[in-house]
Amino acid sequence: MRLYIPYISKKYNLDKNQKIIFWLFVLFWSGITVVRAYRKLYAISPMEEGGLGFSVILAAQITSAYGLISCFIRLPIFILSDIFNRKKIFIQIALFVLTLASLMVVLKPSYNTLYFSSIAMGICASMLAVFNVLFSETFSKEKAAISASILSIAPLLAEFIAAPIQYLSTYGTYKNFKLLWALSASISIVAFVLTFFVRDVSYSAKRFSFEKVKKVFEFKGYLYICLIAILVSFIKFSTSGANMIAYAKVNLNMPPIFLAYIDVLFAFPQLIASVLAGTYFANKIGIEKTLVLGLGSNLVFYIIILLTNSYLPAFLGYVFNGFGYGIAYTCLISMAMQYFEKEDRNVSMGIFQLFFAMGVYFGDRVYLWISKLIPNGLLGFEQNKSIYLIVVGITLVSILMAQFKIKEDI
Protein backbone atom coordinates (compact mmCIF):
# COMPACT_ATOMS: atom_id res chain seq x y z
CA MET A 1 0.00 0.00 0.00
CA ARG A 2 2.87 2.38 0.82
CA LEU A 3 4.32 1.73 -2.64
CA TYR A 4 0.96 1.92 -4.40
CA ILE A 5 0.12 5.44 -3.22
CA PRO A 6 3.37 7.03 -4.53
CA TYR A 7 2.79 5.15 -7.80
CA ILE A 8 -0.69 6.66 -8.19
CA SER A 9 0.65 10.08 -7.21
CA LYS A 10 3.37 9.90 -9.84
CA LYS A 11 1.23 8.36 -12.59
CA TYR A 12 -1.49 11.01 -12.36
CA ASN A 13 0.92 13.80 -11.40
CA LEU A 14 -0.96 14.82 -8.25
CA ASP A 15 -0.10 18.30 -7.01
CA LYS A 16 0.35 19.38 -3.38
CA ASN A 17 -3.28 20.39 -2.89
CA GLN A 18 -4.55 17.08 -4.28
CA LYS A 19 -2.25 15.17 -1.91
CA ILE A 20 -3.43 17.20 1.09
CA ILE A 21 -7.08 16.58 0.19
CA PHE A 22 -6.33 12.86 -0.08
CA TRP A 23 -4.62 12.60 3.32
CA LEU A 24 -7.23 14.83 4.94
CA PHE A 25 -9.86 12.39 3.73
CA VAL A 26 -7.89 9.48 5.23
CA LEU A 27 -7.91 11.14 8.67
CA PHE A 28 -11.47 12.40 8.28
CA TRP A 29 -12.73 8.91 7.50
CA SER A 30 -10.60 7.31 10.23
CA GLY A 31 -12.39 9.41 12.85
CA ILE A 32 -15.70 7.98 11.65
CA THR A 33 -14.52 4.42 10.99
CA VAL A 34 -13.14 3.89 14.49
CA VAL A 35 -16.66 4.09 15.95
CA ARG A 36 -19.23 3.75 13.17
CA ALA A 37 -19.34 -0.06 13.01
CA TYR A 38 -19.52 -0.37 16.81
CA ARG A 39 -22.55 1.86 17.45
CA LYS A 40 -25.01 -1.01 17.40
CA LEU A 41 -22.78 -3.39 19.36
CA TYR A 42 -22.19 -0.71 22.02
CA ALA A 43 -25.93 -0.21 22.32
CA ILE A 44 -26.99 -3.88 22.60
CA SER A 45 -24.05 -5.31 24.58
CA PRO A 46 -24.85 -6.05 28.24
CA MET A 47 -23.64 -3.49 30.79
CA GLU A 48 -21.34 -6.05 32.41
CA GLU A 49 -19.54 -6.30 29.05
CA GLY A 50 -19.13 -2.54 28.70
CA GLY A 51 -22.26 -1.93 26.63
CA LEU A 52 -25.42 0.04 27.36
CA GLY A 53 -27.84 -2.90 27.43
CA PHE A 54 -30.40 -1.40 25.03
CA SER A 55 -33.01 -3.37 23.08
CA VAL A 56 -32.66 -4.13 19.36
CA ILE A 57 -35.35 -1.53 18.64
CA LEU A 58 -33.46 1.25 20.44
CA ALA A 59 -30.24 0.17 18.72
CA ALA A 60 -31.97 0.36 15.32
CA GLN A 61 -33.19 3.87 16.14
CA ILE A 62 -29.63 4.92 17.00
CA THR A 63 -28.07 3.49 13.84
CA SER A 64 -30.84 4.82 11.57
CA ALA A 65 -30.14 8.38 12.79
CA TYR A 66 -27.03 8.19 10.60
CA GLY A 67 -29.13 7.91 7.44
CA LEU A 68 -31.97 10.12 8.66
CA ILE A 69 -29.80 13.22 9.04
CA SER A 70 -28.20 12.46 5.68
CA CYS A 71 -31.59 12.70 3.98
CA PHE A 72 -32.00 16.25 5.27
CA ILE A 73 -28.54 17.71 4.77
CA ARG A 74 -26.87 16.15 1.72
CA LEU A 75 -28.65 18.26 -0.89
CA PRO A 76 -28.61 21.53 1.16
CA ILE A 77 -24.86 21.12 1.69
CA PHE A 78 -24.25 21.07 -2.03
CA ILE A 79 -26.60 23.98 -2.67
CA LEU A 80 -24.92 26.09 0.04
CA SER A 81 -21.41 25.14 -1.05
CA ASP A 82 -22.36 26.17 -4.58
CA ILE A 83 -23.88 29.47 -3.43
CA PHE A 84 -20.90 30.39 -1.25
CA ASN A 85 -18.42 28.81 -3.66
CA ARG A 86 -16.77 27.05 -0.71
CA LYS A 87 -16.55 23.43 0.44
CA LYS A 88 -13.83 23.36 3.08
CA ILE A 89 -15.94 25.18 5.69
CA PHE A 90 -18.56 22.40 5.62
CA ILE A 91 -15.88 19.76 6.21
CA GLN A 92 -14.64 21.81 9.17
CA ILE A 93 -18.14 22.10 10.64
CA ALA A 94 -18.64 18.33 10.30
CA LEU A 95 -15.35 17.62 12.07
CA PHE A 96 -16.28 19.97 14.92
CA VAL A 97 -19.65 18.25 15.40
CA LEU A 98 -18.06 14.78 15.31
CA THR A 99 -15.45 15.78 17.89
CA LEU A 100 -18.11 17.25 20.19
CA ALA A 101 -20.38 14.21 19.86
CA SER A 102 -17.53 11.75 20.50
CA LEU A 103 -16.49 13.60 23.65
CA MET A 104 -20.10 13.58 24.89
CA VAL A 105 -20.24 9.78 24.51
CA VAL A 106 -16.97 9.45 26.43
CA LEU A 107 -18.12 11.71 29.27
CA LYS A 108 -21.72 10.50 29.53
CA PRO A 109 -22.66 7.42 27.46
CA SER A 110 -26.43 7.20 27.05
CA TYR A 111 -29.13 6.78 24.42
CA ASN A 112 -29.13 10.53 23.72
CA THR A 113 -25.36 10.94 23.37
CA LEU A 114 -25.01 7.80 21.23
CA TYR A 115 -27.91 9.01 19.07
CA PHE A 116 -26.20 12.40 18.67
CA SER A 117 -22.95 10.60 17.82
CA SER A 118 -24.77 8.68 15.09
CA ILE A 119 -26.15 11.97 13.75
CA ALA A 120 -22.64 13.44 13.76
CA MET A 121 -21.35 10.45 11.80
CA GLY A 122 -24.18 10.92 9.32
CA ILE A 123 -23.23 14.57 8.89
CA CYS A 124 -19.61 13.57 8.30
CA ALA A 125 -20.58 10.78 5.91
CA SER A 126 -22.50 13.38 3.91
CA MET A 127 -19.15 15.08 3.33
CA LEU A 128 -17.85 12.06 1.40
CA ALA A 129 -19.43 13.38 -1.77
CA VAL A 130 -18.12 16.88 -0.96
CA PHE A 131 -14.64 15.38 -0.92
CA ASN A 132 -15.35 13.66 -4.24
CA VAL A 133 -16.45 16.92 -5.85
CA LEU A 134 -13.63 18.92 -4.24
CA PHE A 135 -11.11 16.38 -5.52
CA SER A 136 -12.73 15.99 -8.95
CA GLU A 137 -12.66 19.77 -9.46
CA THR A 138 -8.88 19.55 -9.51
CA PHE A 139 -9.16 17.21 -12.53
CA SER A 140 -10.49 17.69 -16.05
CA LYS A 141 -14.03 16.59 -16.97
CA GLU A 142 -12.70 13.48 -18.72
CA LYS A 143 -10.92 12.31 -15.56
CA ALA A 144 -13.90 12.41 -13.17
CA ALA A 145 -14.01 8.60 -12.93
CA ILE A 146 -10.25 8.47 -12.30
CA SER A 147 -10.52 11.02 -9.48
CA ALA A 148 -13.23 8.91 -7.81
CA SER A 149 -11.05 5.81 -8.10
CA ILE A 150 -7.99 7.54 -6.60
CA LEU A 151 -9.97 8.94 -3.67
CA SER A 152 -11.49 5.51 -3.00
CA ILE A 153 -8.09 4.40 -1.64
CA ALA A 154 -8.54 6.64 1.41
CA PRO A 155 -11.29 4.62 3.17
CA LEU A 156 -9.13 1.49 3.03
CA LEU A 157 -6.28 3.31 4.74
CA ALA A 158 -8.80 4.48 7.33
CA GLU A 159 -9.86 0.87 7.94
CA PHE A 160 -6.24 -0.17 8.47
CA ILE A 161 -5.84 2.63 11.01
CA ALA A 162 -9.09 1.73 12.80
CA ALA A 163 -8.84 -2.08 12.90
CA PRO A 164 -6.04 -2.49 15.48
CA ILE A 165 -7.62 0.25 17.62
CA GLN A 166 -10.96 -1.57 17.51
CA TYR A 167 -9.40 -4.90 18.41
CA LEU A 168 -7.38 -3.56 21.34
CA SER A 169 -10.51 -1.87 22.69
CA THR A 170 -12.83 -4.90 22.39
CA TYR A 171 -10.80 -8.13 22.57
CA GLY A 172 -11.51 -8.79 26.25
CA THR A 173 -14.73 -9.84 27.95
CA TYR A 174 -15.21 -6.21 28.96
CA LYS A 175 -15.30 -3.95 25.89
CA ASN A 176 -13.74 -0.50 26.27
CA PHE A 177 -16.12 1.27 23.89
CA LYS A 178 -15.35 4.65 25.47
CA LEU A 179 -11.76 4.40 24.23
CA LEU A 180 -13.00 4.11 20.64
CA TRP A 181 -14.97 7.35 20.94
CA ALA A 182 -12.05 9.11 22.65
CA LEU A 183 -9.72 8.18 19.79
CA SER A 184 -12.36 9.27 17.27
CA ALA A 185 -12.34 12.73 18.86
CA SER A 186 -8.52 12.86 18.80
CA ILE A 187 -8.25 11.89 15.13
CA SER A 188 -10.96 14.39 14.20
CA ILE A 189 -9.05 17.21 15.91
CA VAL A 190 -5.93 16.38 13.87
CA ALA A 191 -8.01 16.33 10.68
CA PHE A 192 -9.57 19.68 11.59
CA VAL A 193 -6.11 21.26 11.82
CA LEU A 194 -5.17 19.81 8.42
CA THR A 195 -8.19 21.45 6.75
CA PHE A 196 -6.49 24.83 7.04
CA PHE A 197 -3.90 23.67 4.52
CA VAL A 198 -6.49 22.76 1.85
CA ARG A 199 -7.13 25.19 -1.00
CA ASP A 200 -10.74 25.51 -2.18
CA VAL A 201 -11.33 25.55 -5.94
CA SER A 202 -13.40 28.65 -6.72
CA TYR A 203 -15.29 29.52 -9.88
CA SER A 204 -16.24 32.85 -11.34
CA ALA A 205 -19.09 31.14 -13.17
CA LYS A 206 -22.72 31.56 -12.12
CA ARG A 207 -23.42 29.85 -8.81
CA PHE A 208 -26.46 27.83 -7.74
CA SER A 209 -29.68 28.46 -9.60
CA PHE A 210 -32.73 26.46 -10.59
CA GLU A 211 -31.40 26.62 -14.12
CA LYS A 212 -28.59 24.34 -12.96
CA VAL A 213 -31.12 21.91 -11.49
CA LYS A 214 -33.09 21.96 -14.72
CA LYS A 215 -29.91 21.37 -16.69
CA VAL A 216 -29.08 18.32 -14.58
CA PHE A 217 -32.51 16.75 -15.05
CA GLU A 218 -32.42 17.40 -18.78
CA PHE A 219 -30.04 14.47 -18.91
CA LYS A 220 -32.70 11.76 -19.20
CA GLY A 221 -30.73 8.96 -17.54
CA TYR A 222 -29.87 10.95 -14.41
CA LEU A 223 -33.04 10.29 -12.38
CA TYR A 224 -32.76 6.61 -13.19
CA ILE A 225 -29.20 6.59 -11.83
CA CYS A 226 -30.55 8.17 -8.62
CA LEU A 227 -33.24 5.48 -8.25
CA ILE A 228 -30.64 2.73 -8.54
CA ALA A 229 -28.56 4.63 -5.95
CA ILE A 230 -31.39 4.20 -3.40
CA LEU A 231 -31.34 0.44 -3.91
CA VAL A 232 -27.55 0.14 -3.86
CA SER A 233 -27.20 2.17 -0.65
CA PHE A 234 -29.98 0.14 1.01
CA ILE A 235 -28.18 -3.07 0.01
CA LYS A 236 -24.88 -1.83 1.37
CA PHE A 237 -25.94 -0.33 4.69
CA SER A 238 -28.35 -3.10 5.66
CA THR A 239 -25.63 -5.76 5.26
CA SER A 240 -22.41 -4.09 6.40
CA GLY A 241 -20.87 -1.87 9.06
CA ALA A 242 -22.73 -1.76 12.38
CA ASN A 243 -25.41 -4.19 11.21
CA MET A 244 -22.89 -6.80 10.07
CA ILE A 245 -20.79 -6.42 13.24
CA ALA A 246 -23.88 -6.98 15.40
CA TYR A 247 -25.06 -9.95 13.30
CA ALA A 248 -21.61 -11.56 13.34
CA LYS A 249 -21.20 -11.13 17.11
CA VAL A 250 -24.70 -12.13 18.21
CA ASN A 251 -25.65 -14.76 15.61
CA LEU A 252 -22.31 -16.19 14.50
CA ASN A 253 -20.29 -15.69 17.70
CA MET A 254 -17.44 -14.23 15.66
CA PRO A 255 -14.21 -13.71 17.69
CA PRO A 256 -13.12 -10.10 18.49
CA ILE A 257 -10.08 -10.24 16.18
CA PHE A 258 -12.33 -11.17 13.24
CA LEU A 259 -14.84 -8.47 14.20
CA ALA A 260 -12.07 -5.86 14.30
CA TYR A 261 -10.77 -6.75 10.85
CA ILE A 262 -14.02 -7.57 9.08
CA ASP A 263 -14.34 -3.98 7.84
CA VAL A 264 -10.80 -4.24 6.43
CA LEU A 265 -11.94 -7.36 4.59
CA PHE A 266 -14.74 -5.22 3.15
CA ALA A 267 -12.61 -2.17 2.40
CA PHE A 268 -9.68 -3.89 0.68
CA PRO A 269 -11.71 -5.49 -2.14
CA GLN A 270 -13.79 -2.30 -2.22
CA LEU A 271 -10.61 -0.38 -2.99
CA ILE A 272 -9.53 -2.82 -5.70
CA ALA A 273 -13.01 -2.77 -7.22
CA SER A 274 -13.24 1.04 -7.09
CA VAL A 275 -9.95 1.43 -8.94
CA LEU A 276 -10.75 -1.26 -11.50
CA ALA A 277 -14.28 0.05 -12.07
CA GLY A 278 -13.10 3.47 -13.20
CA THR A 279 -9.83 2.57 -14.88
CA TYR A 280 -10.45 -0.87 -16.41
CA PHE A 281 -13.92 -2.45 -16.36
CA ALA A 282 -15.81 0.64 -17.58
CA ASN A 283 -13.52 0.87 -20.61
CA LYS A 284 -13.64 -2.86 -21.37
CA ILE A 285 -17.27 -3.84 -20.85
CA GLY A 286 -19.12 -0.54 -20.38
CA ILE A 287 -20.47 1.17 -17.29
CA GLU A 288 -23.82 -0.68 -17.11
CA LYS A 289 -22.23 -4.15 -17.34
CA THR A 290 -19.65 -3.09 -14.76
CA LEU A 291 -22.49 -2.14 -12.41
CA VAL A 292 -24.14 -5.53 -12.98
CA LEU A 293 -20.82 -7.23 -12.19
CA GLY A 294 -20.67 -5.43 -8.85
CA LEU A 295 -24.24 -6.33 -7.91
CA GLY A 296 -23.57 -9.95 -8.85
CA SER A 297 -20.65 -10.00 -6.44
CA ASN A 298 -22.93 -8.70 -3.66
CA LEU A 299 -25.38 -11.49 -4.44
CA VAL A 300 -22.71 -14.14 -3.81
CA PHE A 301 -22.20 -12.86 -0.26
CA TYR A 302 -25.90 -12.78 0.58
CA ILE A 303 -26.32 -16.38 -0.56
CA ILE A 304 -23.34 -17.42 1.60
CA ILE A 305 -24.94 -15.78 4.66
CA LEU A 306 -28.27 -17.49 4.00
CA LEU A 307 -26.63 -20.91 3.71
CA THR A 308 -24.22 -20.81 6.66
CA ASN A 309 -24.32 -20.46 10.43
CA SER A 310 -20.53 -20.43 10.78
CA TYR A 311 -18.53 -17.24 11.19
CA LEU A 312 -15.61 -18.27 8.95
CA PRO A 313 -17.54 -18.53 5.62
CA ALA A 314 -19.30 -15.27 6.51
CA PHE A 315 -15.99 -13.56 7.29
CA LEU A 316 -14.31 -14.72 4.07
CA GLY A 317 -17.44 -14.20 1.99
CA TYR A 318 -17.55 -10.56 3.11
CA VAL A 319 -14.91 -9.96 0.44
CA PHE A 320 -17.63 -10.29 -2.22
CA ASN A 321 -19.77 -7.68 -0.46
CA GLY A 322 -16.93 -5.16 -0.41
CA PHE A 323 -15.92 -5.86 -4.01
CA GLY A 324 -19.49 -5.50 -5.22
CA TYR A 325 -20.12 -2.24 -3.40
CA GLY A 326 -16.81 -0.79 -4.58
CA ILE A 327 -17.80 -1.35 -8.18
CA ALA A 328 -21.43 -0.26 -7.79
CA TYR A 329 -20.73 2.96 -5.88
CA THR A 330 -17.88 4.02 -8.16
CA CYS A 331 -20.02 3.41 -11.25
CA LEU A 332 -22.94 5.41 -9.87
CA ILE A 333 -20.92 8.32 -8.48
CA SER A 334 -18.92 8.54 -11.71
CA MET A 335 -22.10 8.65 -13.79
CA ALA A 336 -23.52 11.31 -11.48
CA MET A 337 -20.51 13.56 -12.23
CA GLN A 338 -18.99 12.73 -15.59
CA TYR A 339 -21.89 13.89 -17.75
CA PHE A 340 -21.72 17.43 -16.35
CA GLU A 341 -19.30 20.35 -16.42
CA LYS A 342 -17.26 21.10 -13.28
CA GLU A 343 -19.46 24.01 -12.21
CA ASP A 344 -22.58 21.79 -12.39
CA ARG A 345 -21.23 18.84 -10.41
CA ASN A 346 -22.21 20.28 -7.02
CA VAL A 347 -25.87 20.19 -8.04
CA SER A 348 -25.74 16.80 -9.76
CA MET A 349 -23.89 15.25 -6.83
CA GLY A 350 -26.15 16.90 -4.24
CA ILE A 351 -29.32 15.50 -5.79
CA PHE A 352 -27.67 12.10 -6.22
CA GLN A 353 -26.61 12.08 -2.55
CA LEU A 354 -30.16 12.92 -1.43
CA PHE A 355 -31.41 9.74 -3.10
CA PHE A 356 -28.43 7.74 -1.81
CA ALA A 357 -29.14 8.89 1.76
CA MET A 358 -32.67 7.49 1.56
CA GLY A 359 -31.20 4.03 1.06
CA VAL A 360 -28.80 4.58 3.96
CA TYR A 361 -31.70 5.45 6.28
CA PHE A 362 -33.91 2.54 5.21
CA GLY A 363 -30.93 0.16 5.37
CA ASP A 364 -30.73 0.73 9.13
CA ARG A 365 -34.43 1.29 9.74
CA VAL A 366 -35.42 -2.03 8.16
CA TYR A 367 -34.20 -3.88 11.27
CA LEU A 368 -36.77 -2.07 13.38
CA TRP A 369 -39.53 -3.02 10.91
CA ILE A 370 -38.40 -6.65 10.77
CA SER A 371 -38.40 -6.96 14.56
CA LYS A 372 -42.01 -5.71 14.63
CA LEU A 373 -43.51 -7.21 11.45
CA ILE A 374 -41.79 -10.59 11.12
CA PRO A 375 -40.54 -11.57 14.60
CA ASN A 376 -40.51 -15.24 13.57
CA GLY A 377 -38.58 -14.70 10.36
CA LEU A 378 -39.45 -15.12 6.69
CA LEU A 379 -39.83 -18.26 4.54
CA GLY A 380 -38.15 -20.48 7.09
CA PHE A 381 -35.26 -18.10 7.81
CA GLU A 382 -34.96 -16.68 11.33
CA GLN A 383 -35.48 -12.97 11.93
CA ASN A 384 -31.88 -11.78 11.58
CA LYS A 385 -31.34 -13.74 8.37
CA SER A 386 -34.55 -12.47 6.80
CA ILE A 387 -32.90 -9.17 5.87
CA TYR A 388 -30.52 -11.04 3.57
CA LEU A 389 -33.44 -12.74 1.85
CA ILE A 390 -35.04 -9.33 1.30
CA VAL A 391 -31.75 -7.92 0.01
CA VAL A 392 -31.38 -10.79 -2.49
CA GLY A 393 -34.68 -9.71 -4.05
CA ILE A 394 -33.68 -6.03 -4.12
CA THR A 395 -30.31 -6.90 -5.66
CA LEU A 396 -31.98 -8.88 -8.44
CA VAL A 397 -34.27 -5.92 -9.17
CA SER A 398 -31.21 -3.62 -9.27
CA ILE A 399 -29.45 -5.94 -11.71
CA LEU A 400 -32.46 -5.92 -14.01
CA MET A 401 -32.67 -2.13 -13.85
CA ALA A 402 -28.96 -1.71 -14.58
CA GLN A 403 -28.93 -4.27 -17.38
CA PHE A 404 -32.02 -3.27 -19.30
CA LYS A 405 -32.57 0.42 -18.64
CA ILE A 406 -29.37 2.40 -18.07
CA LYS A 407 -27.95 1.46 -21.46
CA GLU A 408 -31.20 2.48 -23.05
CA ASP A 409 -31.33 5.88 -21.31
CA ILE A 410 -27.68 7.00 -21.41
Show which residues each predicted segment covers.
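Structural signature of the two symmetry-related core transmembrane helices
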Residues: 89-103, 289-303
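Juxtamembrane intracellular "pre-TM" segments in multi-pass secondary transporters
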Residues: 1-18, 200-227
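C-terminal membrane-cytosol helix-exit motif in multi-pass small-molecule transporters
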Residues: 166, 185-204, 398-406
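Helix-to-loop junctions at the C-terminal end of transmembrane segments
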Residues: 73-85, 273-286, 371
